[in-house]
Amino acid sequence: LFRPPERFTLETTARINPAANTKLSGLYLSNGVFCTQCEAQGFRRITWYLDRPDVLARFRVRLEGPQAMLPVLLSNGNPISRGTFGDGWHYATWEDPYPKPAYLFALVAGDLAVRRDHWRTRSGRAVELAIYTEPAFIDQTAHAMESLKRAMRWDEDRFGLEYDLDVYNIVAVGDFNFGAMENKGLNIFNTA
C-alpha cells in the first residue's frame, strides 16, 4: 500500500511463541498464565507496530482459548462480547474507546481467582471492579480492593476525575518483570 488513503484500517496477523519468551516482555506464558509487559518497547515483541509513546490508537482485542485452561480472558477497555465456540473454547472481545500508546496495552489469560466489587462514580455511573490472582493469594486481596476504591474516590475529590470505563481490573501474578504496570483498565502487579 504505497499511497494509502488518509484514513484506513490495517489488520495484521502475527505468529509468536509466548511459552518460549523468557524475557517477560511482550506476551509471555508463565505458570499457565499468559501475561503482557509492553513498557517500554514490549509491544513490538507481539506484533509490528510504531511502538512510541506519541503514537496513539484505539484497540479492539479478541482473545480465544480453551475454557478449562484459560477461564479468564482480560484486556484493556470494556468487554463488548463473550461466547463459546468449538469443543470447549470461548472468547472475549475487549474494546478501549480511548486512544493510547502501545506500551499501555495489556492482556492476561489464565486460571485465576477473582474478588469482585463495584464503584459508583460521582455522576452515578456504575463501574465493575475485579482483582484477579492465583487462587492461593485471593484471601490477600481485600485490602487491595479497599485501596482501589479509596484511590478512585481521591481522584474524584482531588482532581474531579471520574473513571471513564465500565470495568477496572487488577491482576497480581508471581512472574511479572516489573513491580507493577498501570495499564489503563487492567493493572498488573507482581505478588512478591
Model-derived segments and their meaning:
Residues 1-30, 86-88:
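A surface-exposed beta-strand-loop module
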Residues 28-33, 43:
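Intramembrane catalytic core of multi-pass membrane enzymes that act on lipidic substrates
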Residues 35-41, 49-192:
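Hydrophobic helix-coil surface modules that form long, contiguous segments used
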